[in-house]
Amino acid sequence: MDMSITSRDYVSATNPDCKAKQYTITIDGGYEASVITYGAVITDLIVPDKDGKPTDIMLGCKGLDEYMGNGANHGAVIGRSANRIKDASFVIDGVKYQIPKNEGENNLHSRNPGYQNVFWDAEILSEEEADEIILDSKIAGIPGCDGGAVLLSYTSPDGATGFPGNLDTKVLYCWLEDKTFLILYCGKTDKDTIFAPTNHAYFNLRGENAEGTVNNDLIMINSDKITIKDDMNVPTGELKDVEGTVFDCREYRFIGELNDSDDHQMVISKGIDQNFCLNTTAGTFSFAAAVTSPESGITMECLTDLPGIQIYAGNNLGSPLDIKTTKAYGQYDAICLEAQLVPNAVNLTGFDSPVIKAGKKVYHACGYRFV
């Protein structure tokens, strides 16, 4: 099959006037990705297993209504600020900003209206148009687009969820020439603000409806240090060497070893939910992590220019909305590889700042490559 991009209405089952668009990007070899304009959600990611069988490795929801009630943020772009902010407050240019306290005294994933719960505009781009955006990012090492792309756009208004500035945001989705599915973020603001997005994709390389957990899959992380978190899962600014610990994933280890560990950092979050400081190079699309399934034979690498990656194993999956086709999802049924800035970095020193300056265009990239 040649490369193609198709679209269809993605309609609420309860309100026919409520609808998004779904775009499906297909390339040779049996690789297919679908995204919707609500939440910039990746609904499907289909790749061949070791026998060539098409396998949807993306957990998700049944339809638009479920995605709109999607507390787990399946496949969604998160922002303006992904992950946690201590005391739900921060200071920019001498001004203190208070955002909603939605996880105890802290803020998690910005919330409504955040990127994950609004409707985005969309357009289909040619390969040449997508490559122009990739070049404009000035992130080295991103291969060329394979055939075409979908570009989603949303302006987060000044004061949304307490954040300053009108923040014009774009997300480019496309397959690259080396079988990488690329997520390229771009933000530009009229007032200094936070721009720290991620995508909350949940992966199961045996298939989204496969029985059992991901504990028997293997993970590798290009990281020598983790950020220590407090008992509310917020990084304190302290770093810990992974050497000699369960966090040492510089060579493949079973995901279950992490989830079953009695390390206090794991106990806090009922399994792995940790930011790893990556050995990546700023401004370069670099290897961050990989997951492989011996059962399906699928190996997926994560590449990014970002300095951190949150590894999360679906420790809290299990709501009635956590079902896409035939299986109700539960704890440890997925692995998330969330390339991002260090959580709570706006309140810490020694980490890349999530604050972008007025008038400056900022790009970040994350890609999932199948090898």
Show where each model-derived region lies.
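An exposed, glycine/acidic-rich loop-and-rim segment of catalytic or binding clefts
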Residues: 2-371
